[in-house]
Amino acid sequence: GSNGEPGSAGPPGPAGLRGLPGESGAVGPAGPPGSR
């Protein structure tokens, strides 16, 4: 973006691995900030 303007945050990480049947994993962490 413009000088001094932080980039937008990255997209959420992929879903975590599934645990027991029918149990979805936790969502991954957000991506790193975008470039300035």
Swiss-Prot record:
Annotated localization: Secreted, Extracellular space, Extracellular matrix
The entry's keywords: Collagen, Extinct organism protein, Extracellular matrix, Hydroxylation, Repeat, Secreted
Cellular compartments per GO CC: collagen trimer; extracellular region
Pfam family, one: Collagen
PTM annotation, UniProt: Proline residues at the third position of the tripeptide repeating unit (G-X-Y) are hydroxylated in some or all of the chains.
Region of interest (Disordered), ranges: 1-36
UniProt keyword Secreted present: yes
Low complexity composition bias: residue spans: 15-29
Residue numbers carrying 4-hydroxyproline: 6, 12, 33
Keyword Repeat carried by entry: yes
Subunit: Trimers of one alpha 2(I) and two alpha 1(I) chains.
Function description: Type I collagen is a member of group I collagen (fibrillar forming collagen).
Protein family (similarity comment): Belongs to the fibrillar collagen family.
Misc. remarks from the entry: These protein fragments were extracted from an 80-million-year-old fossil. The tryptic peptides required multiple purification steps in order to eliminate contaminants and to increase the concentration of peptidic material.
Protein name as annotated: Collagen alpha-2(I) chain
